[in-house]
A protein has these predicted regions:
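Acidic, Ser/Thr/Pro
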Residues: 2-180
Length: 180
């Protein structure tokens, strides 16, 4: 029977853990869900945000979270904005919202974190840490329907820093195993 010392066992455990986590980080974890019966706004080309922020990525340094959002109507666009952009859009008066000359808080506004104006290709966004809100708007005054159904998928994989941490973990285990 092989009698390994504590350092050897711990080093071997670190190396195995680093390899397993690297494999799991490469494969990734995917979650899917849907939200049904979201009421749509009737003000053309204006964004209305959700009250609650999206779940942030507190481990953004180690884990990449990529979201793909699809919806069932072509007369609706989706945006993702930070808390400052939400406050700006929520602070607009009705006259400012219906102003066709303004691009603020519309589908043409480039200050959003992500804009999805086509329900066929959807909206792709890499989740970041911080407060981000989903907003919806309609392209026309009279929407085709009063409800919106959204499907989303979030895939989480290791970032480059995550792999670097696993290499350091493996090297630490190797060092503990090699040098008693």
């Amino acid at each position: 029977m092989i009698n390994l010392q504590v350092n050897n066992k711990f080093g071997f455990g670190l190396m195995v853990a680093a390899v397993l986590f690297s494999i799991l980080g490469t494969i990734g974890l995917t979650t899917k869900d849907s939200v049904d019966s979201i009421p749509t706004p009737n003000v053309p080309n204006s964004v209305f945000f959700a009250d609650e922020p999206m779940q942030s990525n507190p481990l953004a340094l180690l884990i990449n979270s990529n979201a793909q959002i699809d919806w069932d109507r072509n007369d609706v666009f989706l945006v993702i904005g930070d808390a400052d952009k939400k406050a700006q859009c929520d602070g607009l008066t009705f006259i400012e919202m219906v102003n066709q000359n303004s691009e603020v808080c519309t589908s043409r506004d480039n200050e959003f974190a992500a804009i999805g104006d086509d329900n066929q290709s959807g909206l792709s966004w890499q989740a970041k840490s911080g407060e981000y809100f989903v907003g919806i708007g309609t392209f026309s005054e009279a929407p085709e329907d009063f409800e919106l159904n959204i499907d989303y998928e979030v895939k989480m994989t290791f970032s480059a820093v995550g792999y670097f941490v696993m290499v350091i973990l493996f090297a630490s285990g190797f060092t503990l195993n090699k040098y008693q």
